[in-house]
């Protein structure tokens, strides 16, 4: 009780002073319906459900995957998003020596959602600043609605258990003091549905089959064979005969040894009936049945049946797991943290977001093809690709530029016009040979005319 008393030592939130008791609209705590008895006769509580390997594997997969995702804070203004410093209460929710870190807080938050449908976190304030978060036991928080100025508001009734096992009221608190992250809610409700409660028949059947199998095989609950002898035997005679048979036919050294039966004894092997063997198929069927409850791919909890229905490649299966299994829970947690961020800063442009890049990474060949296309089309810079592959940037800013094909130029710059083609070379005309000048004076005889002949005569 010391932890709760220190956490809620003030008894109630001052914001609730002056509100009349009749204004409370209590919500029936039986919505949690934890510890109900299934038709199989098994009592199903979160602790009992975790004894089923499929339940444990499903909640472990979701809680540990979400808890290890990077969580960043951003500021979005003017259509652009810029990463800013993450508040300490998100990076170090409980920084005291021996306190829990972010992974522990997130893991417990997701476990509360998966097992009980609701997560409650105590918010520790120091003046106007949040200084830490603590995950609360959902079974010790009752949610109510109160009418304030005609509006319905959530308030939380916190309980603890004293040394005598009695329930002790610690006080009433507002959403400023207790962050409530609900799971899937029915229309008109304001608390989440418990998956364990609504699936108690499936989980109860798995528990019953598991218990039946344990009892079936415990200490040879059904004998593998029977030796019949005529007449009657005393208890001492039966014990001697049983011990003699065990000594002669049990153990590795006596394997496949021929057994000799005397005095009319008969050996009969006892086979498992179909009804008795049915629990094996029942247990096998419960694995995908429980995986379906939590929305996880069965192949991720070691049931490879129909694994290709979630995608044919690693990248496709990871994307499907991210979209259909993780994203709904991540959105709820992000919304809760965003409410706290606004309560602390009054800045509605700030928000937190999980980074899913790591889980959506494909095989090396697929990643290299993606980076190659991104680099060629100016989507990524070389340094961004290197950072995604956990490599250091290129020196001297060589990897900061975005590049596109040469016919487009660099991103952010006007492409240089292509140079005009050079005019074709003009060949000089071929030189004609010079004509010989005609000699002056008397022409040749061959070229003489008749008139010239007459003159000569």
Swiss-Prot record:
GO-annotated biological processes? proteolysis; symbiont genome ejection through host cell envelope, long flexible tail mechanism
Keyword hit for Metal-binding: no
Where is this chain compositionally biased, Acidic residues type? Answer: 429-438, 446-457
Complex formation: Homododecamer.
Is Transmembrane helix one of the keywords UniProt gives this record? no
Query: Which Gene Ontology molecular-function terms are recorded?
Result: DNA binding; peptidase activity
Report the domain of life of the source organism: Viruses
Q: Return the Pro residues bias intervals.
A: 418-427
Q: Where in the cell is it found?
A: Virion
Q: What is this protein for, i.e. what is its function?
A: Forms the portal vertex of the capsid. This portal plays critical roles in head assembly, genome packaging, neck/tail attachment, and genome ejection. The portal protein multimerizes as a single ring-shaped homododecamer arranged around a central channel. Binds to the terminase subunits to form the packaging machine.
Lineage, top ranks:
Viruses, Duplodnaviria, Heunggongvirae, Uroviricota, Caudoviricetes
Q: Which UniProt keywords apply?
A: Capsid protein, DNA-binding, Hydrolase, Protease, Viral capsid assembly, Viral genome ejection through host cell envelope, Viral genome packaging, Viral long flexible tail ejection system, Viral penetration into host cytoplasm, Viral release from host cell, Virion, Virus entry into host cell
Record protein name field: Probable portal protein
Cellular component, GO annotation: viral capsid
Q: Which Gene3D superfamilies match?
A: 1.20.1270.210, 3.30.1120.70, 3.40.140.120
Stretches the record annotates as Disordered:
391-457
Q: Which family, according to UniProt?
A: Belongs to the phage portal family.
């Amino acid at each position: 009780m010391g932890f709760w008393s220190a956490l809620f030592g003030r008894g109630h939130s001052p914001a609730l002073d002056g509100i009349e008791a009749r204004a409370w609209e209590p919500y029936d705590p039986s919505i949690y319906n934890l510890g109900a008895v299934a038709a199989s006769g098994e009592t199903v509580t979160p602790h009992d459900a975790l004894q089923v390997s499929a339940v444990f594997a499903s909640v472990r997969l979701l809680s540990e995957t979400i808890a290890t995702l990077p969580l960043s804070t951003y500021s979005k203004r003017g259509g652009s998003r810029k990463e800013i410093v993450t508040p300490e209460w998100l990076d170090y929710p409980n920084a005291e020596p021996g306190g829990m870190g972010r992974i522990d807080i997130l893991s417990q938050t997701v476990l509360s959602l998966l097992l009980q449908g609701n997560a409650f976190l105590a918010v520790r304030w120091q003046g106007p600043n949040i200084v830490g978060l603590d995950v609360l036991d959902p079974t010790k928080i009752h949610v109510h609605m109160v009418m304030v100025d005609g509006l319905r508001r959530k308030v939380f009734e916190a309980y603890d258990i004293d040394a005598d096992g009695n329930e002790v009221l610690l006080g009433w608190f507002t959403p400023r003091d207790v962050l409530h992250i609900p799971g899937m809610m029915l229309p008109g409700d304001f608390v989440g549905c418990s998956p364990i409660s609504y699936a108690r028949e499936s989980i109860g059947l798995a528990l019953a089959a598991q218990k039946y199998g344990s009892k079936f095989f415990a200490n040879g609950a059904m004998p593998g064979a029977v030796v019949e002898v005529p007449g009657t035997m005393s208890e001492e005679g039966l014990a001697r005969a049983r011990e003699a048979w065990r000594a002669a036919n049990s153990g590795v050294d006596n394997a496949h040894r021929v057994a000799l039966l005397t005095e009319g004894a008969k050996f009969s092997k006892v086979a498992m009936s179909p009804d008795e063997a049915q629990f094996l198929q029942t247990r096998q069927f419960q694995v995908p049945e429980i995986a379906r409850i939590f929305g996880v791919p069965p192949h991720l909890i070691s049931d490879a049946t129909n694994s290709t229905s979630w995608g044919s490649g690693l990248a496709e299966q990871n994307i499907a797991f991210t979209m259909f299994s993780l994203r709904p829970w991540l959105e709820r947690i992000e919304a809760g943290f965003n409410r706290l961020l606004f309560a602390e800063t009054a800045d509605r442009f700030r928000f937190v977001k999980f980074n899913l890049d790591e889980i959506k990474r494909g095989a090396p060949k697929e990643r290299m093809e993606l980076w190659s296309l991104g680099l060629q089309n100016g989507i990524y810079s070389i340094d961004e690709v290197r950072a995604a592959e956990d490599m250091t940037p290129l020196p001297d800013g060589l990897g900061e530029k975005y590049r596109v094909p040469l016919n487009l130029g660099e991103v952010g710059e006007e492409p240089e016009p292509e140079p005009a083609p050079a005019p074709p070379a003009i060949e000089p005309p071929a030189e004609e040979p010079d004509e010989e000048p005609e000699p002056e004076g008397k022409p040749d005889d061959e070229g003489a005319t008749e008139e010239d002949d007459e003159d000569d005569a």
